[in-house]
């Protein structure tokens, strides 16, 4: 029987030993699903995660369960992935849930709230702090549920044609930004634009937008933003550890054999780890290339960050006052963040800062 590469990982081997047995694999039905992504095929990080996920599922079932992946626009536009799953036009989608905060604001926390947790703490909250249950409660009206399948790590703050020296420079700025960060910046005069990944560069090139945030150096380099915007800001305070999910139609999910459900969940975990590790391997080199090509790195000024932080708290509190689900999700997230940061500030931050002091001059 074909060797299943994703089963070699310790995190998934135990949960999938049973379904890997030849007799069981032979007894499983042949099933074909379609997966639509919100991202272009050119992004071998994010879209590559969808392909890796589908590959793992196929390998673990001896190709009995095949998931065909489609990039944004091939079946449905990138921003309509949740709708496609909800109506069962496709069985599943790869999409960041903060794309749909217009439908349910609490979904912001599923990807990551502004000034929220880093990637590891965010995923810990998902598994152990109630994040998954709260998200799936939010998705229930859409007849779907979420499987965690990736994280970008802390993102960059975006590409700007002009420098951001003060809060006044934000006023009137047409900024492509997804999720709750755009709502926060609107309070400071920004005109947020939500545009799917494959459509961003033309909008920036034509001047339809003045600035864009997407992910980080590697993906941003691939999409060519450095060709039309000189200043590259950090940090992406609206995405401290952005989670990515597979959204599955509940009826289609319930029709799967239990063994296939186990494989899908574990393939999501394995592909998600692959995604974060991929970013760690490719972002440093991409950032060096961008700098060599004339990109100017800029940190957001402290007064700008303070204004954004205060506007974030005001906005999140306003939403919590209007929605019980948002309030419960916010309280769960904030309590978990406070708890994990208690330890992080003692051990990890001290270690990381010391190590940076020893290596910074060598990079």
Where are these regions (language model features)?
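N-terminal secretory/targeting leader peptides
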Residues: 2-19, 24-122, 130-363
